Design a protein with these regions (language model features):
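Anion-binding and metal-coordination hotspots
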Residues: 1-140
């Protein structure tokens, strides 16, 4: 597993910051987003079928259901525009590819902050990994 660590500047100057990127974290982030996206799209298709079959008729209920759907999948709902056309009685789902690609480019990236200014980026990362392993031992 490859990990890249770069130092970054704190805006206030009172913290040490490390910008990290990990291949493993990238794969994990993509898998999580894909799972949520599949579920979101499946649920939006179910909603469209309910509307088409006449099970949901009032606009208020339809918009409420759209809101619940967006609330249930906030990680991926921001990349889609769900719109209900009242005259045709259809639900449309449009994907915002630019926004999605921008988020995908950040997969695997994370910031580590420390109040200890004497630590460089590598030391911050090593301390983070050590603490993560200690936490895992206590959880086991």
């Amino acid at each position: 597993m490859r990990v890249l660590v770069k130092p970054a500047q704190s805006p206030d100057g009172f913290q040490s910051i490390a910008l990290c990127w990990s291949e493993g974290r990238t794969q994990k982030d993509r898998a999580i987003r894909q799972k949520h996206e599949d579920r979101f799209l499946a649920d939006s298709e179910k909603l469209a079928k309910r509307i088409a079959l006449g099970r949901l008729r009032t606009s208020a209920k339809i918009y409420e259901t759209i809101g619940r759907l967006k609330e249930r999948y906030p990680r991926v709902a921001r990349y889609y525009q769900l719109a209900y056309d009242e005259q045709q009685g259809q639900l449309s789902c449009l994907e915002d590819l630019q926004r999605k690609q921008k988020a995908e480019s950040l997969d695997g990236s994370y910031l580590l902050k420390s109040s200890r200014k004497n630590l460089d980026a590598e030391d911050i990362w090593r301390t983070y990994i050590l603490l993560s392993r200690v936490e895992a031992v206590f959880r086991a």
